[in-house]
């Protein structure tokens, strides 16, 4: 588990070293790491809670205990939930338990982590995606206080915001459009092994994992068909290269700008307040994007268990 975390986590500090002329870590990078770490711990605690809580339907039948379905006894619930959270936060794709057998909200944790694709994320790509959220946060906060948006002494203007918005939208568009196609294309939905809320979760997870280049899946989905193999391959290809190209264009636009010394009127990016605001904006932006689909999937399934 630790080996999966080292490189993506250390790249945040590498970014901090690159911002400093001396051999020091820029405090802005530390604040980004704090935001990532707090969100990671929050998702881990959520997954642990719902997995140890178990299945309400079984509790009504007098069968107490956590959710051990799909898990090896040598790992148990705790280590399985930990591995699940790490492998999807750091997008490695390895598994030590069946994600399809997680409780609805326990299974929503890896799904949401891949939807964000920025809580550490993959090597390099996770940091790039987080910087998109950072620039969106700086832009919105600057407008809220009536200041010219700027990041690290470089003004964020219309051209950059268009590219930032496009880069932000690629990931959810690929997930949602191809998930919709899975229910529209004749025969594609035959792969579903669950006709209700969990079937929606299986489809969402499949394309979320493909778009995040993760590799794990809700393996109850019979996805070894022409539609699923081709569609997930297209999603992997587009989700990998389009954001990278857009982010390179953002960087090339910013580096050609005249930089200036940051002053007190700018949005502060080197304190815990910025980390808190960054977390809030990530939750708000992602919630507005994915919450309706999560309601049709894991959240609806959890409510059904309590019905």
From Swiss-Prot:
Entry's localization field: Cell membrane
Residues annotated as transmembrane: 30-50, 75-95, 102-122, 125-145, 164-184, 234-254, 272-292
Keyword Ion transport in record: yes
Main location group: membrane
Alphabetical UniProt keywords: Cell membrane, Ion transport, Membrane, Potassium, Potassium transport, Transmembrane, Transmembrane helix, Transport
UniProt cross-references to PANTHER family, sorted A to Z: POTASSIUM-TRANSPORTING ATPASE A CHAIN, POTASSIUM-TRANSPORTING ATPASE POTASSIUM-BINDING SUBUNIT
The protein's name in its UniProt record: Potassium-transporting ATPase potassium-binding subunit
């Amino acid at each position: 588990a630790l080996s999966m975390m080292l490189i993506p986590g250390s790249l945040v500090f590498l970014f901090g070293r690159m911002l400093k002329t001396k051999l020091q870590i820029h405090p802005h990078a530390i604040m980004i790491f704090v935001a990532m770490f707090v969100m990671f711990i929050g998702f881990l605690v959520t997954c642990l809670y719902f997995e140890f809580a178990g299945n309400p339907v079984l509790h009504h039948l007098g069968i107490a205990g956590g959710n051990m379905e799909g898990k090896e006894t040598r790992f148990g619930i705790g280590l399985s939930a930990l591995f699940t959270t790490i492998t999807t936060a750091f997008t490695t794709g390895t598994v030590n338990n069946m994600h399809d057998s997680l409780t609805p909200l326990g299974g929503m944790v890896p799904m949401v982590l891949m939807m964000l694709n920025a809580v550490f994320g993959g090597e390099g790509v996770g940091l790039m995606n987080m910087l998109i959220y950072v620039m969106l946060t700086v832009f919105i906060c600057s407008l809220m206080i009536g200041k010219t948006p700027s990041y690290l002494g470089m003004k964020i203007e219309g051209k950059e915001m268009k590219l930032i918005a496009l880069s932000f939208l690629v990931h959810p568009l690929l997930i949602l459009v191809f998930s919709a196609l899975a229910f529209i294309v004749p025969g594609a939905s035959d792969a579903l092994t669950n006709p209700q809320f969990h079937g929606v979760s299986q489809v969402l997870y499949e394309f979320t994992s493909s778009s995040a280049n993760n590799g794990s899946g809700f393996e109850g989905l019979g996805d070894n068909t022409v539609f699923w193999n081709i569609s997930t391959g297209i999603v992997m290809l587009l989700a990998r290269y389009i954001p990278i190209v857009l982010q390179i264009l953002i960087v090339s636009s910013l580096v050609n700008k005249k930089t200036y010394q940051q002053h007190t009127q700018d949005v502060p990016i080197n304190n815990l307040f910025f980390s808190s605001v960054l977390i809030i904006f990530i939750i708000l932006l992602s919630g507005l994007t994915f919450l309706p689909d999560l309601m049709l999937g894991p959240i609806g399934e959890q409510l059904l268990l309590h019905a």
